[in-house]
């Protein structure tokens, strides 16, 4: 692939990730729904999607996004991102999520498939060479305590809370 096309693809992917973040931050859930892949939209109606996100309002507040490494192969892309924000309920805490955003290109437009595990698994199974030079990682959640980022690890189902 010529360098100019690759750079253009990476730029388009970054632009899509930033646009989707701003839609989520501004609670523009209808537009956010339009950026989902066809497979996601076929499984969930716009009303159900919007309603689910509206129920989460007041629990967290997004503040900013850092976009890191972008890898594009054909109609697939993975982007390293860090989302910063605050948890407002049931406790107040500053937090960040280090997560890879998965995108698929459909009808010439990049669409974010990150929350759609079925699409992501299908994407990875169909493209085993994709993670060459780009390690696929699980999301990590951090909270700030005493000025330091501490990774939050929820108890597993086998652990008991005391």
Task: Give, region by region, the residue ranges found by the protein language model.
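Exposed beta-sheet edge and beta->alpha loop/turn motif
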Residues: 72-162
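Repeat-mediated protein-protein interaction surfaces in helical alpha-solenoids
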Residues: 1-4
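Short solvent-exposed beta->alpha transition segments
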Residues: 14-22, 26-80
């Amino acid at each position: 692939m010529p360098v100019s096309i690759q750079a253009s693809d990476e730029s388009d992917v970054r632009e899509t990730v930033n646009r989707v973040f701003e839609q989520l931050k501004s609670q523009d859930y209808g537009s956010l729904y339009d950026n989902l892949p066809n497979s996601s939209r076929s499984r969930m109606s716009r009303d159900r999607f919007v309603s689910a996100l509206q129920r989460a309002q007041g629990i967290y507040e997004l503040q900013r996004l850092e976009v890191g490494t972008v890898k594009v192969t054909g109609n697939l892309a993975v982007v390293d991102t860090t989302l910063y924000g605050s948890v407002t309920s049931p406790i107040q805490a500053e937090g960040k999520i280090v997560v890879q955003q998965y995108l698929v290109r459909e009808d010439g437009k990049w669409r974010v498939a990150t929350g759609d595990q079925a699409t992501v698994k299908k994407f990875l199974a169909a493209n085993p060479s994709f993670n060459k030079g780009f390690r696929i990682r699980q999301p990590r959640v951090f909270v700030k305590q005493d000025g330091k980022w501490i990774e939050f690890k929820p108890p597993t189902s086998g652990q008991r809370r005391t």
